[in-house]
């Protein structure tokens, strides 16, 4: 049986552009029947888009999305999970794995590597590595991110894994770990391949992971130009020159893919990420990305509803040393809503009953669905136990077993 509890009172504090919200006392649980075996659904940003505050401008791209990095919500999308050709957006994963190797001490920024014959002869964009001159890892990273150098990509792949083929195996394993369900890589560069694809959703996932997991390396994405081997090349992300709030991330282009761009903007402490693919030109991908970023920042608020590990309610526990467990969220909870509508949010707690001891802190016990004024789900978040509950003794467990048996007779389960 699923227990449903409406948390009626939210304390709203307005600070500048951002609405801050904090929960107050919860009302008594409201019961709702549901199969006992059903598990709480995990939050799915694509399935819980906020209701549009104002009309989304026309986006001229074959696929796109815009995402709020605090709440984890997709605010608008088109062909979110369809396979697309990433082109040099592939290098987001190449860079992610290099950042990981640096973090783990497997590479050092001042280590040097010489471009292989494969890397030197590779087609497409390059940083113009000299086969006679070893290059430092930190220079190779700038050549990869700023200049989109395929020679830099292959050299870094070989530095991390010994060969590009072995590096590609790491890329696919990391994609799986990150939950990129519609991605498969064939190379580190983004050159076309029959089984080289990703999706807009997966690019959002990867981009958010870079920003969250490796903030110390993220400033590389805002570099406007880089000189190597006496050759200066500009960053092809035109938004870096046009919008002071934009600080990344990566461009991509092939004849078959069109012009792609992952862009990120941070304004007044709030970050949004956009993806556009299949546009007609460098100018077009910048213009369409700018539309998405500005629409998201101007049309939506992302209030903080709960601090990390704040108890929002108690849930009845059977067969436990304690009769109830405090539930809440592991991390601070943000929800993105149309501008000015934060006060209308109504959180509804749902737990699968019965909740049986033993319970470990951090164990998922249900979800909170955030409903708008029309009773539509805006977002949902897993709710977890905030404390351990040990198992009761023999007689305590026996008594609760009897209680649950009688409850099942009357509930029909």
Regions found by a protein language model. Give the residues of each.
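Domain-terminus/edge residues, biased toward the C-terminal soluble/receptor-binding domains
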Residues: 180-184, 192-197, 201-413
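Hydrophobic alpha-helical membrane context
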Residues: 15-16, 103, 300
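Structural motif marking the loop-to-transmembrane transition
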Residues: 2, 86, 137, 391, ...
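Sec/Tat signal peptide C-region and signal peptidase I cleavage site
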Residues: 17-21
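Bacterial N-terminal signal peptides
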Residues: 8-16
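Bacterial N-terminal signal peptides that target proteins for export
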Residues: 1-7
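Active-site-adjacent loops and short helices of periplasmic peptidoglycan-processing enzymes
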Residues: 22-204, 208-214, 226-229
């Amino acid at each position: 049986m699923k227990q449903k509890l409406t948390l009626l009172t939210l304390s709203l504090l307005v600070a500048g552009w951002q609405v801050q919200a904090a929960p107050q006392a919860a009302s008594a649980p409201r019961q709702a029947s549901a199969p006992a075996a059903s598990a709480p659904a995990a939050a799915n940003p694509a399935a819980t888009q906020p209701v549009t505050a104002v009309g989304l401008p026309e986006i001229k791209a074959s696929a796109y999305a815009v995402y709020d990095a605090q709440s984890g919500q997709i605010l608008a999308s088109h062909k979110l999970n369809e396979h697309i050709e990433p082109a040099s957006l592939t290098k987001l994963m190449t860079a992610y794995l290099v950042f990981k190797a640096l973090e783990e001490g497997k590479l050092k920024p001042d280590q040097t590597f010489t471009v292989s014959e494969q890397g030197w002869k590779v087609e497409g964009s390059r940083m113009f590595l000299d086969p006679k001159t070893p290059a430092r890892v930190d220079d190779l990273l700038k050549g990869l991110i700023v200049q989109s150098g395929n020679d830099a990509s292959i050299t870094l792949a070989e530095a991390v894994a010994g060969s590009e083929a072995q590096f590609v195996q790491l890329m696919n394993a990391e994609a799986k770990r990150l939950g990129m369900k519609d991605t498969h890589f064939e190379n580190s560069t983004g050159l076309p391949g029959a089984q080289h694809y990703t999706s807009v959703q997966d690019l959002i996932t990867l981009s958010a992971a870079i920003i969250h997991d490796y903030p110390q390396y993220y400033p590389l994405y805002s570099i406007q130009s880089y000189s190597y081997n006496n050759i200066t090349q500009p960053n092809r992300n035109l938004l870096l020159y046009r919008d002071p709030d934009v600080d990344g991330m990566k461009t991509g282009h092939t004849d078959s893919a069109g012009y792609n761009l992952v862009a990120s903007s941070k304004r007044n402490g709030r970050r949004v990420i956009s993806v556009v693919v299949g546009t007609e030109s460098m100018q077009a991908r910048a213009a369409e990305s700018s539309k998405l970023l500005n629409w998201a920042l101007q049309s939506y608020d992302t209030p903080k509803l709960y601090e990390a590990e704040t108890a929002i309610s108690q849930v009845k526990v059977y067969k436990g040393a304690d009769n109830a467990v405090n539930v809440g969220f592991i991390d601070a909870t943000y929800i993105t809503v149309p501008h000015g509508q934060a006060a209308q949010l109504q959180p509804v707690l749902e737990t699968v009953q019965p909740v049986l001891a033993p319970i470990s802190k951090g164990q998922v016990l249900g979800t909170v669905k955030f409903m708008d004024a029309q009773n539509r789900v805006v977002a949902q978040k897993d709710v977890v136990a905030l404390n351990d509950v040990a198992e009761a003794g023999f007689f305590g467990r026996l008594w609760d077993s009897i209680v649950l048996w009688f409850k099942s007779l009357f509930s029909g389960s």
